[in-house]
Amino acid sequence: DETANVKRAAQRVAWGKGINCGQTCVAPDYFLVHENVVDDLVKQLDECFHQYYGADILACDEWPHMINRHHFDRVMGLIENRNPNARVAFGGRGDAETLRIEPTCLTGVTLDDPVMGEEIFGPVLPVLTYRTLDEAFDIVRTFEKPLACYVFSDDKQVQHRVLTGLQFGGATVNDVVIHLANNHMGFGGVGNSGMGAYHGKVGFDCFTHYKSTLKKGTWIEMPIRNPPFGDKINLLRMLMR
């Protein structure tokens, strides 16, 4: 939200999106930004990517490439097939020889754009804006429950509302991705993003079948539970209340 440290948010989102150039299941998929800080955020993102990967990112040996030509073409198509009012704030170029695509930020995106219709799994970051937190929630709930949610805010009430008011697999506050690196916390999805969780004790429990077992002695029998019941029915009903 508008209380967030915009520079830190840009640094950390650029880092998380840059891991395998967005080809991870927990990469930031889209950025929902308060309208008062969106211009600053986009500017800072552009600067961060170039700080990390140099002036010509397509020529940077540390910038990963797409897994194959099919996905290169798919992601380039998401950039090119945007609505007429959407624009490439930075990036947008691809090299079919190396299968590299520049970190690309799209602004003016609508929920009907192809880039919002699938998991991107590439270095494209659409930016949507909101005015109120309720409006932001409505946008998030348009989609299936995500595997990860990242909230950047210095307002603890906003953090609490996001963490308790939305459904997602796991979350990080004021950073991205790193929640899954903690082996003491479960990692997994909910609904369309997955079932169950693993890591540490949570993983042990997930892949363990706990057999419910009851052991009884044989020194006495309870005739009240055995037929014929007759007048015992009323007593049984009292005991079962």
Where are these regions (language model features)?
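ALDH superfamily catalytic-core signature
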Residues: 1-110, 173, 235, 240-241
